[in-house]
Amino acid sequence: IAKKMGRSDAECELLYQAGILHDIGKIVTPDSILLKPGKLNDLEYKLIQEHVKVGYDLLSKIPMYKEMAEIIAYHHEHYNGRGYPYGAKGEEIPFLSRIMIVADAFDAMTTNRIYKGKKDVAEAIEEIEALSGKQFDPEVVETAVEILSKIEIPDSVNQLPMTEVEKERFAYFYRDQVTNAYNADYLTFILKQKSIEKKPCFFHIVSLHNLGLYNKNHGWKEGNKLLRRFVELRQ
């Protein structure tokens, strides 16, 4: 986008590097917020907004990253002044930041998130055009649409857990505290993902009958032991 808009090779490279580091401030965002599979409440939203300032503070202290920090500091601003953290508007937002804002939004829209399915390219472009002059610089949007319409997004682009470490991070939301088995929320999440991917799947349903009676006769601690043992046998 920057190249198409006549920016120098040095500026394009600077913006590219800033794009890689633009969310580095999220290293201080708690997983309970960052990975939450649902809408954030007001406090959580306020806390996640802090990642912009944290990212700027981290990078601006390193001479070779200072220019990148200036770009990153504005990547959640809106063209109409309703963004954060500064409420900057129009040309108060650095030009390279205005490009990053559009590119970042397109990336977010076309990536499968733990809490939200992705849009296809046409849907994302339609939303970007609808927000031209509000969230986005109209001049940037005009060029971005031309570039982004030619992009093909593979189905594999997502933010879903792949490694064992990532799966353990997500366990906060999706594992039962007693048995460590995946819970009903995880089943809902899987079904939602499969519907987005339009891929067939099948499930085995196993019922454990009369657990209430077992708890009544032996106590809930023994009932929990039975549940854990049952889960171990099924894994």
Annotated model-derived regions:
Residues 174-175, 180-202, 209-234:
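Conserved long alpha-helical elements within nucleotide-processing catalytic cores of c-di-GMP signaling
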Residues 150-178, 189-193:
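Signal-transducing coiled-coil/dimerization helices and immediately adjacent hinge/linker segments
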Residues 21, 205-208:
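Alpha/beta-hydrolase
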Residues 2-5, 15, 168-176, 181, ...:
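A conserved signal-transducing helical linker
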Residues 37-41, 172-173, 216:
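A short, mixed-charge helix-start or loop-turn motif at secondary-structure junctions
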Residues 106, 208-209:
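PAS/PAC or PAS-like capping segment
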Residues 1-165:
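Histidine- and acidic-residue-rich, metal-dependent catalytic cores
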Residues 101, 202-204:
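Protein kinase-like catalytic core scaffold
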